Structures are given as C-alpha cells and as structure tokens.
Amino acid sequence: MLTLLAILAVSYIIGSIPTSLVAGKLLKGIDIRNFGSGNAGGTNAFRVLGWKPGLVVTLIDIVKGVVAAVSVVAFFRHHPIGAFPDMNEVALRLLAGMSAVIGHVFTLFAGFKGGKGVSTAAGMLIGIAPVSMLMVVGIFLLTVYISRHVSVASMLAAIAFPLIIAIRKYIFELGSGLDYYIGLFGSPISFHDSLDYHLMIFGLIVALAILYTHRTNIRRLISGTESRVTFGKKH
C-alpha cells in the first residue's frame, strides 16, 4: 500500500508542474490564466503565446504523463516501500498516469487551477500504448491543420483512442498487445504496445471526461467564437 501511495504522490507532483504558467511568466511576464480562455493548458498557450511556445508547453505536458506511467512505476518496482502492488500492470500505470493528470488539472503549485489534462493524459497513453497513440497523434495533427482548432483536435483524438484499441484488439485480433524492437545508436530497444481491455474502458471514460472539460469550447464552437491557431509568427 505504501508503494502505491508513493507512486500516486510522486506522479501527482510531476503532473502539477505548471508548464504553461512558467512559459507565460518567462516569455511575457503574464499569468496565462488571465488571457485567452483563462485556462492553464497547452491549448491556451497556443492561443496566447503562439504556436512555437504552445508546442513546447504541450510536449512537456506530454512528457509528464509518460514519466508518471513508465518511469515512476519502474522506479518503485526496483525501489519499493514494502511490497509492490499486486495488480494488473496496465491498471497500475493508468493509476499513476491519472494521478499526473489530476496534478495537471488541479496543480499543487498554482492554487489548484491548472489545465484540462489532455496532453498529460496523451503522454500517459503514449507510455502504455505507443503505436495506438501514434495513430491518435496523426488524427490530432491532421485535425489541427484542417480546422485550426486545438480544442476540436483534442476531442476528436480522445474519441478515436478507445475505437483504435477496440479495432486493433478485436477486428485485427492482436490480443493483449505486441512487443516491438528497434535499433537506436547500435543498441536494441524493446517496448510493449498494450491492447489490454483496461485501456479500452479507460479510453471511453477519458473521452467523456475530455468532452466535459471542453464544454465551454463546444459552446464557443457552436457560436463561432472559438479562437483558431495560426501558424505564422506571433506578434
């Protein structure tokens, strides 16, 4: 139990790192929550700071999820506090990742007012199901390019994930996942791309949660007032 609590606590602290707030202070000396949509996430960073800072913020928020789901769990597996949790590996990684997402949304370092958790949740899932998430990222980028709405891309990508898991698992009959081996700088690296059923259930819950957290964006989309991302230079 102590090991599980430690995993959740460390993951929460990592998720709480307020990336967009730090970027806003460093680049413009502002609290990004006072501009744009008022949200401290990647979407508002794109909107307020420009696409380059927005991209950096988003990538760092993604890394927070990967670290929580992969590195934190791996660390405490080798350095447990008492017994290591006897539970499904994917379920444990999902718990760690979700703790990071909660930290991102309710950040410890900024009055518990953070982002919407999309990028950190994406990072968590990249660490668990990288191939499926590569497809989701493709859908996200294509949607941003076509619609210029990061919010639309986030919602569509969230809906796509559980569908991709289900199609690969049941239609293509890939079972619980595949192991991949790649060469990097002359050294073989292996990783597992999970199709565990926990992912499909979790993906459905996350999709609903992301739709809920984007309800103001949906209202702005309906009214035609949702901001669009521009790929030119931000002045």
From Swiss-Prot:
Regarding the membrane, this protein is recorded as: Multi-pass membrane protein
One cellular component (GO) term of this entry: plasma membrane
Q: What is its EC number?
A: 2.3.1.275
Q: Which residues cross the membrane?
A: 4-24, 56-76, 94-114, 122-142, 152-172, 191-211
The enzyme's first-digit EC class, named in words, is: transferase
Catalytic function, reaction form: an acyl phosphate + sn-glycerol 3-phosphate = a 1-acyl-sn-glycero-3-phosphate + phosphate
- Keywords, in A-Z order: Cell inner membrane, Cell membrane, Lipid biosynthesis, Lipid metabolism, Membrane, Phospholipid biosynthesis, Phospholipid metabolism, Transferase, Transmembrane, Transmembrane helix
UniProt subcellular location: Cell inner membrane
Q: Which GO terms describe its biological process?
A: phospholipid biosynthetic process
Molecular function (GO) terms listed?
acyl-phosphate glycerol-3-phosphate acyltransferase activity
Pathway participation: Lipid metabolism; phospholipid metabolism
Which InterPro entries did the record assign? G3P_acylTferase_PlsY
**Its function?**
Catalyzes the transfer of an acyl group from acyl-phosphate (acyl-PO(4)) to glycerol-3-phosphate (G3P) to form lysophosphatidic acid (LPA). This enzyme utilizes acyl-phosphate as fatty acyl donor, but not acyl-CoA or acyl-ACP.
What assembly does the database describe for this protein?
Probably interacts with PlsX.
Which family does the similarity line name? Answer: Belongs to the PlsY family.
Instruction: Give the protein name, as stated in the record.
Output: Glycerol-3-phosphate acyltransferase
